Structures are given as structure tokens and as C-alpha cells.
């Protein structure tokens, strides 16, 4: 019960604060929501992708320890590409917050 109350209060309090300022608009609130979703989902996707990449590399090293160096190099290259997804999400969030 307490968790639900906290979730409801967390969702309502920013709207109350924005209404008190007098500048509140639905469009601005949706921009903030979109920016939060952009970075949140991009981070989630990147985290899941990195987890799968590291797991695959560890399984490969466990099967063939001699290929560890090559697999580690390929994993780091793959992690760099996966991390760009999170950076694109951050870029979209900044565009939504400061340009639109």
C-alpha cells in the first residue's frame, strides 16, 4: 500500500509544482516525458545488449581459453557500438529538452 502511495505522489508532485508556476502546459510535460523515456529505454536496451555481449564472451573464453585475447578485443569493439545506442538516446533527450 505504501509503495502505491509513493508512486502516485511521485507522479503527481511535478504536475502540482508546474501548475504553481503558472507556465504549465501539457505539451511541455509531454516533452519531459518523452525525454525521460528516450534516455530510459536507450539505457535499458544498451544494458541488455552489453549483458548479452559479455555473457557470450565469457562463454567463448570458457570453451576456448586460448582465444580469450581475441574475444576480449572483439567484445570491447562490440560494447563501443552498443554504447552508441545509449548516447543517441541521450542526444534525443537533450534535443527534446533544449531545442524543441
From Swiss-Prot:
GO terms for cellular component: plasma membrane; proton-transporting ATP synthase complex; proton-transporting two-sector ATPase complex, proton-transporting domain. Its main location: membrane. The chain crosses the membrane at residues 30-50, 80-100. Coiled coil: none annotated. The record marks 83 as: Reversibly protonated during proton transport. It is a multi-pass membrane protein. Keywords: ATP synthesis, Cell inner membrane, Cell membrane, CF(0), Hydrogen ion transport, Ion transport, Lipid-binding, Membrane, Transmembrane, Transmembrane helix, Transport. PROSITE patterns: ATPASE_C. One of its GO terms (biological process) is proton motive force-driven ATP synthesis. F-type ATPases have 2 components, F(1) - the catalytic core - and F(0) - the membrane proton channel. F(1) has five subunits: alpha(3), beta(3), gamma(1), delta(1), epsilon(1). F(0) has three main subunits: a(1), b(2) and c(10-14). The alpha and beta chains form an alternating ring which encloses part of the gamma chain. F(1) is attached to F(0) by a central stalk formed by the gamma and epsilon chains, while a peripheral stalk is formed by the delta and b chains. Belongs to the ATPase C chain family. It is found in: Cell inner membrane. This is ATP synthase subunit c. NCBIfam families: ATP_synt_c. Pfam families: ATP-synt_C. F(1)F(0) ATP synthase produces ATP from ADP in the presence of a proton or sodium gradient. F-type ATPases consist of two structural domains, F(1) containing the extramembraneous catalytic core and F(0) containing the membrane proton channel, linked together by a central stalk and a peripheral stalk. During catalysis, ATP synthesis in the catalytic domain of F(1) is coupled via a rotary mechanism of the central stalk subunits to proton translocation. Key component of the F(0) channel; it plays a direct role in translocation across the membrane. A homomeric c-ring of between 10-14 subunits forms the central stalk rotor element with the F(1) delta and epsilon subunits. The keyword Transmembrane applies. SUPFAM superfamilies: F1F0 ATP synthase subunit C (SSF81333). One of its GO terms (molecular function) is proton-transporting ATP synthase activity, rotational mechanism. Gene3D superfamilies: F1F0 ATP synthase subunit C.
Amino acid at each position: 500500500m505504501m509503495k502505491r502511495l509513493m508512486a502516485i505522489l511521485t507522479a503527481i508532485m511535478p504536475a502540482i509544482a508546474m501548475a504553481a508556476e503558472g507556465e504549465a502546459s501539457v505539451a511541455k510535460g509531454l516533452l519531459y516525458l518523452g525525454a525521460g523515456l528516450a534516455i530510459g529505454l536507450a539505457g535499458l536496451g544498451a544494458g541488455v545488449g552489453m549483458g548479452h555481449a559479455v555473457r557470450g564472451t565469457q562463454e567463448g573464453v570458457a570453451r576456448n581459453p586460448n582465444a580469450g585475447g581475441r574475444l576480449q578485443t572483439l567484445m570491447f569493439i562490440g560494447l563501443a557500438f552498443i554504447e552508441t545506442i545509449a548516447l543517441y538516446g541521450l542526444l534525443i533527450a537533450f534535443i527534446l529538452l533544449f531545442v524543441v
